[in-house]
Swiss-Prot record:
Region called Disordered, residue ranges: 1-24
Protein name, entry field: Large ribosomal subunit protein bL32
Protein's organism: Synechococcus elongatus (strain ATCC 33912 / PCC 7942 / FACHB-805) (Anacystis nidulans R2)
Pfam families in alphabetical order: Ribosomal_L32p
Example GO BP: translation
Keyword Ribosomal protein: yes
Length: 58
């Protein structure tokens, strides 16, 4: 079974974990911001299909 030759230092481990958490926090912040803009109707990046009465009856 393959095993690492040396133990990873705590500082390197913590640095990697901090990077991962920072990226996750940034993505969460972007998702929350996007959700808020969609709810308030300020989102410009989405194209909503026009709802015609003919299409809704089908």
């Amino acid at each position: 079974m393959a095993v690492p030759k040396k133990k990873t230092s705590k500082s390197k481990r913590d640095k990697r974990k901090a990077t991962w958490k920072r990226k996750a926090a940034l993505q969460a912040q972007r998702a929350l911001s996007l959700g808020k803009s969609v709810l308030t109707g300020r989102a410009k990046g989405f194209v909503y299909p026009a709802q015609d009465e003919e299409e809704t009856e089908e």
